[in-house]
Amino acid sequence: MAGRPRIKDVAEYAGVSPKTVSNVINNFEHVSDRTREAVKEAIDALGYRVNLAGRQLRQGRTGMITLAVPELDVAYFAELAGLVMAEADRRGRTVLLHRTNGVRERELAALHGFDAQFTDGVILSPLALHPRDLATRDRDLPVVLLGERPAEGGTDHVAIDNVAAAREATAHLLSRGRRRIAVVGGRVRGRQGTDRLRTDGYREALKEAGVPFDGDLVIPVDAFQWRDGARAATALLDTDPRPDALLCLNDHLALGALRALHERRVSVPGSLDVVGFDDIEASRFSVPSLTTVAPDKQEIARAAVALLLDRIDDPGGAPPRDHVVGHELIVRESTGC
């Protein structure tokens, strides 16, 4: 074949229309697996290469999406980032990672900053945004929020039911006879962030069981890191009476707490139960292994990418959607499994 192969050449080789070849190149899902494979074989056989610059110029798109998360040294976000990148790659997109440190200015930069000019849309896990930040954002840039949402409505959103998840975890502890259950990382006032929602679920479970709520057992932390869990557990061991269970609002806190309890020779689960959130890989390998709430991270990634690409393809389409992802309480050794 003389010259560089074109879409027309690929179509003739595969026995399909040029439109079908274009659909395969753009990873449209309605193409059958058999046809998709035939087109890919033709592309490989002819050495066809997509003219990315030309396609982006025609579409006004970059083929890139941004994932903005608070931290990458927190295992939950690192694992989620890997899943989002894999899902985006499957859909023919490249992911630009943006670490915000949970700082409002950096979260705003993901939506309005220099980098936002080079991305087709943003998946953002916010910690510090104000409701007005979303109300005044550039509507030309599609956005999907993960986890916390500063304001109701107006933006596509993917999350687990944090209230139900914490209620289930607390009910598990109550079923084991625990009554003085401390919430490490909890919060009873302020906006409806993840920590507040999980504390609400904890309180609901106590109420359903007829156990009085004790505000002294809600322990705020500076950060959701291992050391903060260890500090909180150490402080709780010096109270009288001690708690008989810890509901830690992420696995980093729980694993830090386990270390502090081990150093103080407190038997887990003999004297005290520990439950975490997120089901990070380390939770399966701690001693004792950690009972934890496992959000469906694979589904979070799939739904977030799908919602964002739908919004990129049809900005004025469906109204903003809330996608609630399932969760599972994984019972392990830290609560007697």
List where the protein language model places each region.
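N-terminal helix-turn-helix DNA-binding module of bacterial transcription factors
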Residues: 1-63
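Amphipathic helical "hinge" segments at domain boundaries
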Residues: 34-37, 46-113, 117-121, 188, ...
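Hinge/beta->alpha junction and helix N-cap segments in small-molecule ligand-binding domains
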Residues: 52, 70-79, 98-106, 158-168, ...
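Periplasmic-binding protein-like
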Residues: 118-126, 182-185, 219, 240-250, ...
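Flexible loop/hinge segments that line or gate small-molecule binding clefts
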Residues: 125-168, 186-188, 211-212, 252, ...
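Short acidic capping loops at alpha-helix termini that bridge into adjacent secondary structure
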Residues: 180, 213-217, 267-273
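Flexible loop/turn connectors
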Residues: 234, 239-245, 249-337
